[in-house]
Amino acid sequence: MAPAVMASSATTVAPFQGLKSTAGLPVSRRSRGSLGSVSNGGRIRCMQVWPIEGIKKFETLSYLPPLSTEALSKQVDYLIRSKWVPCLEFSKVGFVFREHNSSPGYYDGRYWTMWKLPMFGCTDATQVLNEVEEVKKEYPDAYVRVIGFDNLRQVQCVSFIAFRPPGCEESGKA
């Protein structure tokens, strides 16, 4: 009874006939000489290339010189303003490595040791910087990184090196 009462709302669709010619579509045409005056030549001369050897890349801000205390404080302020939870990690080897296996695993340097607990409820960058100083005192020969963790989306949003140990080959060249 129901199929006879209801009207069909389906429409027929023409079968696919292949790609249509674009000749009928409006096209803006540029003159051939219009791109001849555009040049990046002036900018290219002042650009520098990052050296491929001798300077290792760490995290988000690895292409900048080591952060001053003021710059580090501004980065942590941004992290807190973004409602991310600061977390500190440290490692004596600051890089990914594979020692006993060719496939990636837990012990290949991607996971660092967490310093204490994530700083839930942290509202001031000086709290984080004080913890960075504690890590530096306890482990002076370890790399220290700050992570911003979004506890709503449950993802790591930012990670950067807060301290490089003195004497490491990269600490003065960044």
UniProtKB/Swiss-Prot annotation:
SUPFAM superfamilies: RuBisCO, small subunit. Residues 1-45 form a transit peptide. GO terms for biological process: photorespiration; reductive pentose-phosphate cycle. The keyword Cytoplasm does not apply. Heterohexadecamer of 8 large and 8 small subunits. One of its GO terms (cellular component) is chloroplast. Its main location: plastid. This is Ribulose bisphosphate carboxylase small subunit, chloroplastic 1. It comes from Triticum aestivum (Wheat). One of its GO terms (molecular function) is ribulose-bisphosphate carboxylase activity.
